[in-house]
Design a protein with these regions (language model features):
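Bacterial lipoprotein signal-peptidase II cleavage site
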Residues: 22-35
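Extracytoplasmic "Venus flytrap"
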Residues: 55-57, 61-86, 95-112, 126-131, ...
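Periplasmic-binding protein-like
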Residues: 65-68, 118-128, 146-151, 200, ...
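Hydrophobic alpha-helical segments within soluble ligand-binding/sensing domains
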Residues: 107, 168-197, 243, 286-290, ...
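Hinge/cleft segment of the Venus flytrap/periplasmic-binding protein
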Residues: 11, 52-62, 201, 205, ...
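Hydrophobic alpha-helical
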Residues: 126-142, 217, 231-293
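Flexible loop/hinge segments that line or gate small-molecule binding clefts
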Residues: 137-177, 287-295, 300
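Short, solvent-exposed amphipathic alpha-helices that sit
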Residues: 75-90, 178-182, 208-228, 246, ...
Length: 357
């Protein structure tokens, strides 16, 4: 979801999920079935945006504070575009309070400072540390601020989207559901091949979040296709270099691999050492590089996450809550579009961020 500076273990569990989907540079625009996306593909995340008069139905939210992973991160910028689109619709201003670089502690402090000194009525956050941010979110909610967690739920339980902080809203997904979709894609890539040898390039073995995703992948694969055989489970990480090495190790031990799954960054590296005519590749991420690879037939599929709509839906849901509505407090981002990003599925969409910067 990277540059080497991201490999700090501060906030490591959610960093792994961040890396599974994020690039480090600027992004391009995304077409979304669930939300209007801003049209300026080259614009970076703005410090603030001007707002139109509040339409009927929003009397409370005048300012939305956005806390992304870091300002120049292209995944953050893609989500911010959706936040800005939603804010424009409800007539609110957007304040981008993302840290300058990946820094979970600085991100939490920015939330706490805004709660104490700021004047935003709605927070949308991409938490770098889901456990630490849960505390900051509770403080904001206790102060009367509406808080929406985008992309990842807040708290230590990786199996549920249900809010682990009372009053919190969530627009996102769990690593468990992500792992299950990846396994289903692998099973579909296997088709009728018997046996079908599958290699899984997991993220970081030391991280609980990655372990939860891996466990979901393994159990779902076994149930989805009885002919699928997991012959390699190697740490692939979140860079092309680590993915290339993992693919080489997997192939050396198991030369007859038919399907290989890993982070989109790892699969970018793996594609340089596998024969795409023999090995079907699945990347966990919807980066521009992944889109290009699937469209060109180099990869079987990608994980099709709707980043722009995630930001948009966070603002719309938050505004409804802030104005006294009683909507469902959870939006599953896997329902914003079909997450199984085969070539036919992604044909009507455009990418929104880069894995390479």
């Amino acid at each position: 979801m990277k540059s080497s500076k991201l490999l700090s273990l501060a906030g490591a569990s959610v960093l792994a999920l961040t890396l599974a989907a994020c690039g480090s540079g600027g992004g391009s625009s995304e077409s979304s079935s669930a939300a209007p996306a801003p049209t300026d593909a080259s614009s970076s995340a703005a410090e603030s945006s001007s707002a139109a008069p509040a339409p009927a139905g929003n009397e409370v939210v005048k300012k939305v504070a956005f806390f992304g992973f870091w300002k120049t991160n292209s995944f953050t910028q893609a989500v911010l575009k959706g936040v800005e689109a939603g804010a424009a619709e409800i007539g609110a201003e957007v304040l981008d309070l993302s840290p300058a670089e990946y820094d979970a502690a600085a991100q939490i402090k920015a939330v706490q400072d805004q709660t104490i000194k700021g004047d935003a009525q709605l927070y949308v956050m991409l938490a770098s540390d889901s456990v630490g941010m849960a505390t900051a979110a509770k403080e904001a909610i206790d102060a009367g601020i509406t808080v929406v967690a985008a992309f990842t739920p807040l708290g230590a339980d990786f199996t549920t989207l249900e809010p682990q902080v009372p009053g919190l809203a969530v627009v996102g997904e769990t690593p468990v559901s992500n792992g299950a979709i990846l396994a289903e894609l692998a099973a579909e890539a296997c088709a009728d091949l018997n046996p079908c040898n599958v290699a899984y390039l997991e993220g970081f073995k030391a991280l609980p979040l990655d372990n939860a995703r891996t466990e979901a992948f393994v159990s779902t694969l076994a149930a989805a296709n009885p002919n699928a055989k997991l012959v390699a489970q190697v740490e692939g990480g979140y860079s092309p270099d680590s993915g290339k090495k993992a693919a080489q190790d997997a192939l050396q031990a198991n030369p007859d691999i038919n399907v290989m799954v890993g982070s989109s960054q790892a699969i970018l590296g793996a594609e340089t050492v596998v024969d795409p005519a023999k090995v079907k590749l699945v990347g966990n991420g919807a980066s521009c590089e992944a889109f290009e690879a699937v469209t060109a037939g180099k990869w079987y599929a990608l994980y099709n996450l709707d980043t722009v709509s995630m930001g948009y839906e966070s603002v719309i849901l938050g505004s409804e809550i802030a104005n006294g509505g009683t909507p469902a407090m959870v939006v599953n981002s896997q329902e914003l579009r079909d997450p199984k990003g085969t070539a036919d599925v992604i044909a009507s969409y455009e990418c929104a961020y880069s894995d390479l910067g």
